[in-house]
């Protein structure tokens, strides 16, 4: 079966993948869930990628799934070692040089989290529950929000080593009602930058929490032979 390496986005840790891992493991897949060193204010995306690479020691050809911010992490892993597929999940596509004509990326109404004196972005718990996890059951939303970590803003300001994504098999999954990214931008960037047809998921920015069984279905499909959809 398939080995999925699930790389969380900003503020989170591996706990955000737990519902999806449970589904995938019942289907006999293997899941690896590295935890990025967000506590290191000096770390860049290359440092984040090194953590992922170290977790993949001995794994031949994993499927890398990068959520949100980690759409900038998984390409760097693919440059360093073999992978069978990159899955950009509700991706920010940070770091890459977008082609001309890029539409606004941010969803109207999205309110950015505060930034502290050390340049770290952090979510007050109630704001996170209301803005990020409104589709989840309240107890689940509060449990996830309680685990959020400050995200150093500096990582987004460091030079990114790639201008375009690596030419490896890739899939782009976006959420129709993503709370962070405008769906029109998501469809545009998938085709303009990755040259793949985007796959639409129902719901918001966290499909692994909102509908893990559906996400597992899609991941199985895109990682199967012929599953990538090329323009």
Residue ranges of each PLM-predicted region?
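Gly/Ala-rich beta-loop-alpha elbow adjacent to hydrolase catalytic centers
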Residues: 65-74
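Active-site loop/oxyanion-hole signature of alpha/beta-hydrolase fold enzymes
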Residues: 30-63, 101-105
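Flexible "cap/lid" loop of the alpha/beta hydrolase fold
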Residues: 79-125, 152-159, 181-182, 187
């Amino acid at each position: 079966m398939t080995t999925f390496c699930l790389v969380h986005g900003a503020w989170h840790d591996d706990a955000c993948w737990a519902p999806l891992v449970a589904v995938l493991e019942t289907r006999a897949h293997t899941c690896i869930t590295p935890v990025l060193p967000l506590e290191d204010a000096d770390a860049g995306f290359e440092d984040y990628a090194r953590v992922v690479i170290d977790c993949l020691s001995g794994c031949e050809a994993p499927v890398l799934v990068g959520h949100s911010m980690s759409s900038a992490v998984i390409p760097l892993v693919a440059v360093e070692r073999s992978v069978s597929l990159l899955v950009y999940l509700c991706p920010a596509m940070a770091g890459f040089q977008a082609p001309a004509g890029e539409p606004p990326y941010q969803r109207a109404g999205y309110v950015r989290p505060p930034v502290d004196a050390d340049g770290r972005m952090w979510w007050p718990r109630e704001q996170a529950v209301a803005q990020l996890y409104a589709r989840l059951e309240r107890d689940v939303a509060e449990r996830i929000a309680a685990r959020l970590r400050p995200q150093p803003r500096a990582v987004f300001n460091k030079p990114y080593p790639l201008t375009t994504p690596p030419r490896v098999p890739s899939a782009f999954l976006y959420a129709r009602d993503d709370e962070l990214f405008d769906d029109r931008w998501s469809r545009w960037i998938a085709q303009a930058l990755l040259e793949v047809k985007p796959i639409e998921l129902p719901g918001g920015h966290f499909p692994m929490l909102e509908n893990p069984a559906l996400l597992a279905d899609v991941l199985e499909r895109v990682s199967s032979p012929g599953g990538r959809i090329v323009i």
